[in-house]
Amino acid sequence: MTSHPVFIDLSLDEQVQELRKYFKKLGAEISSEKSNKGVEDDLHKIIGVCDVCFKDGEPSQIDGILNSIVSIMITIPLDRGENIVLAYCEKMTKAPNLPLGKVCLQSLWRLFNNLDTASPLRYHVYYHLVQVAKQCEQVLEVFTGVDQLKSQFANCPPSSEQMQKLYRLLHDVTKDTNLELSSKVMIELLGTYTADNACVAREDAMKCIVTALADPNTFLLDPLLALKPVRFLEGDLIHDLLSIFVSEKLPAYVQFYEDHREFVNSQGLNHEQNMKKMRLLTFMQLAESSPEMTFETLTKELQINEDEVEPFVIEVLKTKLVRARLDQANHKVHITSTMHRTFGAPQWEQLRDLLQAWKENLSTVREGLTSVSSAQLDLARSQKLIH
């Protein structure tokens, strides 16, 4: 979302006077006379009635009025501006319809970008900004990812408690439209907890697991097990379910669902979607150890009919987690490469062996090139002597 700088030609006193007159004309309970207590008191009273303009008026006109209020707010010293900014942000969440909601969103974005990047007030503005963006279905205009979020607050990082509150909000506003982004947010949230307070993050940890399991684009779930709040769930059904998605095959999930059907459904998880993901994860695990698989093997392991194998493999290839070739004539699948579901000590050892083999091969090639180069040089010298 773009935002233009705030420039108002009138002086502060003139702006305050005009705003008071405007809102009084709209029927607001406010004096048209400027306060003798200073501009902060004027702003408090103006902001207190500013939502009266939501009842009538064109969005463009209201945008101009709010722009004027913002232009005054950003002149208030930091130590006296917090209550004013919070009051304004709260008013902006009260827009009665979508067009005015977008006006309020633009106004908050303008305020956010015109505050000093080192101002702690930017956090409060951004929090309300996300709330309004949700109302307007414009969340991705103000939040595109965790890295972008952190860069916004690089000069004044919020406290851990503030970030936890913000991450929870971001999870809530993205969970219905972008599960992948929502899952990343929850992982960041759990990462803010330490060993000392991870035990109080039970609800957040459960939400994180459920979001990751429900996301059709999240397949590598092993990192969740390392998060401290998730460790505190060991022994709980949700942790058992996560462990199945991390390292078990389809039959383990089927058995879990038969034993705990009500629990799975109570978490808002879709059984058919779970089956689809577990089939893919099972295929990945089979591909790690079997460079060649028959259709018959896949029908048994994945619990599908033989005529479903080809469409299934094609869907797997679309994820780019596995590279393979279908051999329809011989009813086989030839695996070229696959992502690992988990990456522990065995995978590190395999990677070490692979790199060592590459190193040895490169050394052999280098020695061969050196020999060829020396032979060519000797040949050139001998030909020169002959002539």
From Swiss-Prot:
InterPro entries xrefs: COPS7/eIF3m, eIF3m, eIF3m_C_helix, PCI_dom, WH_DNA-bd_sf
Subcellular location per the Swiss-Prot or TrEMBL entry: Cytoplasm; Golgi apparatus
Location of the PCI domain: 181-340
SUPFAM superfamilies from the UniProt entry: Winged helix' DNA-binding domain (SSF46785)
Described purpose of this protein according to its UniProt entry: Component of the eukaryotic translation initiation factor 3 (eIF-3) complex, which is involved in protein synthesis of a specialized repertoire of mRNAs and, together with other initiation factors, stimulates binding of mRNA and methionyl-tRNAi to the 40S ribosome. The eIF-3 complex specifically targets and initiates translation of a subset of mRNAs involved in cell proliferation.
Subunit text: Component of the eukaryotic translation initiation factor 3 (eIF-3) complex. The eIF-3 complex interacts with pix.
Protein name stated in the entry: Eukaryotic translation initiation factor 3 subunit M
Source organism of this protein record: Drosophila erecta (Fruit fly)
